[in-house]
Each structure stands twice: as structure tokens, then as C-alpha cells.
Amino acid sequence: MTTILQINSAARSQGAQSTMLADELTAKLQQGNPGATVKVRSLLADALPHLDDAVLGAFFTPAEQRSAEQNAIVAKSDALIDELRSADVIVIGAPMYNFGVSSQLKTYFDWIARAGVTFRYTAQGPEGLLKGKKVYVVSARGGKHVGMPTDSQTPFLTTFLGFIGMTDVTFVYAEGLALGPDAASEALASAREAIAAV
């Protein structure tokens, strides 16, 4: 049975275009996999703390030396990683904020990037350990950035996801959402055309 994990990373709980389009993409995937299990994670509703001394200390303390507080921190990270590991398909709603990803998504990545767990270092270089997954990134943007120097989001996501083993990544863009009603309608139509082709 296929498991689809949808990760919503918008900073808005209502009206986020990336979440709306991610919902539509997940629904399209369900049409092709009627028995699929869907899990939705909202990085806004279930906010993670930014990395600090406590979190880093927990991650880098040997298991047998961790305090109860550190064990709880690592258990949270482990749960997030297990959720990813159990998913066959991952849909990420990723709005572009100031040319990059939301702080919610960056923090989530910080909580799942753990040496020896989601990647490891080898004599041949780093190896991602979360392999064999299909990832869709739905990126909603106020301006138009694809192929431009201002698009630091696409290479960052491609690099990070590849680093942990997720190399089969398809991007769906909704660009120009803040450039007026006509541009916004065109952006949504273009994104929905891409979703229909999935």
C-alpha cells in the first residue's frame, strides 16, 4: 500500500497557495492510488524549535549518556524521520519567502538531517539513507524566478533532498501570484496543468 506524506510549510494557516496546490496534488495522487494512506504534517501547527544548545546537545550526545530531556528531543527527531522513512511519496508545499524556503521548512530539515540516521559519510563521500522515494515540491511564488539568480529555493531543495537520498524530485511552480489578478490566474492554471500531468 502506498503511503503519501504531505508536508505543509507555509507560515499562514489559511489562504496559503502552496498548501492549496499541495492539497490538489495529493488528491491527484490518491486518484491513481485509491488505497493510499495519506499523512499530512503542518509545520506551522506542529512547530519545531530552531536549533539551539539543547537540541544540538541532544543530537550529539551518545545515547547512553543522554538525559531524559535529551532523550525526548531525539525521540521527536526519530519520529519525524520514521514518518519520512515510511512514506513512498512525499509532497512538500513550499512557498518562496525572500528567495528561499520558510523558516518552518528549514527548521524541519535541521531536525531530520542527522549523520548516521538520514545520511552517512563514507570514503566515497556522503551517502543519503532515505532512498527510493518520489518527491513533489509545490512552490508558490509572488514573482517569477525559475531559471533566474533569484531562485535560490530550487537548488537548495534539490541539494538537501538529494543529500538525504531523495533524488527523484519533481517541482510544480506557481509563479507570479503577486503580479496582479491575470498573472495570478495564469500561475494557478499553469500549476494545475502540471498537477494534472502527474
From Swiss-Prot:
Residues that, per the record, bind FMN = 96-99
The record describes how the cofactor is bound as:
Binds 1 FMN per subunit.
**Function as written in the Swiss-Prot or TrEMBL entry:** Quinone reductase that provides resistance to thiol-specific stress caused by electrophilic quinones. Also exhibits azoreductase activity. Catalyzes the reductive cleavage of the azo bond in aromatic azo compounds to the corresponding amines.
Q: Which Pfam families match?
A: Flavodoxin_2
Q: What is this protein called?
A: FMN-dependent NADH:quinone oxidoreductase
Q: Which EC number(s) are documented for this chain?
A: 1.6.5.-, 1.7.1.17
GO molecular function term, any single one? electron transfer activity
Cite the entry's keywords alphabetically. Answer: Flavoprotein, FMN, NAD, Oxidoreductase
Upper classification of the organism: Bacteria, Pseudomonadati, Pseudomonadota, Betaproteobacteria, Burkholderiales
Q: Which family does it belong to?
A: Belongs to the azoreductase type 1 family.
